[in-house]
Amino acid sequence: MADSAGAGAAGQASGPAGGSSGAGGTVNPASLPPGDPQLIALIVEQLKSRGLFDSFRRDCLADVDTKPAYQNLRQKVDNFVSTHLDKQEWNPAMNKNQLRNGLRQSVVQSGMLEAGVDRIISQVVDPKLNHIFRPQIERAIHEFLAAQKKEAVPAPPPEPEGQDPPAPSQDAS
């Protein structure tokens, strides 16, 4: 039972997302339609291999602690933790891990982290999306697809060597 859909699905699962390119029956990414899951996986792998995601992460982390949203969230969490710990009556028999886990659950359930992270993203990541990240991603994708198209174009067949060129006609006198 060798149907082409099964072969295609198997090819996707073990496809060239590991970074190999060239021969071996791999699909030419330039021939895949936009939005194809295999094409997306190949592009993401290419962006990772170029270090773009690491570069974006470093760029954002270098900027995050200067933003008011981060400073505000940090202050809120500090105050929340202080208030929570002030309500605890300390004794040497306390299980510190249980106390820590209870505190962690309280912080998460308060919703302040989710809201604070959303504000940090809007102050740090969003301004960089269209002017920094998108152009770099688009350039990398275009270069990747152009390189794949170049690999996929076969070389023109060589001139046959065994044949003599046609003899010139002797009509002109």
From Swiss-Prot:
Any GO CC annotation of this UniProt entry: Set1C/COMPASS complex
GO terms for biological process, alphabetical: cell division; mitotic metaphase chromosome alignment; mitotic sister chromatid biorientation; mitotic sister chromatid cohesion, centromeric; protein localization to chromosome, centromeric region
Record keywords: Cell cycle, Cell division, Centromere, Chromosome, Cytoplasm, Cytoskeleton, Kinetochore, Mitosis
Residue spans of biased composition, Low complexity class: 1-15
Described purpose of this protein according to its UniProt entry: Required for proper chromosome biorientation through the detection or correction of syntelic attachments in mitotic spindles.
Family per record: Belongs to the BOD1 family.
Record-given protein name: Biorientation of chromosomes in cell division protein 1
Source organism per UniProt: Rattus norvegicus
Lineage: Eukaryota, Metazoa, Chordata, Craniata, Vertebrata
Gene that this polypeptide is encoded by: Bod1
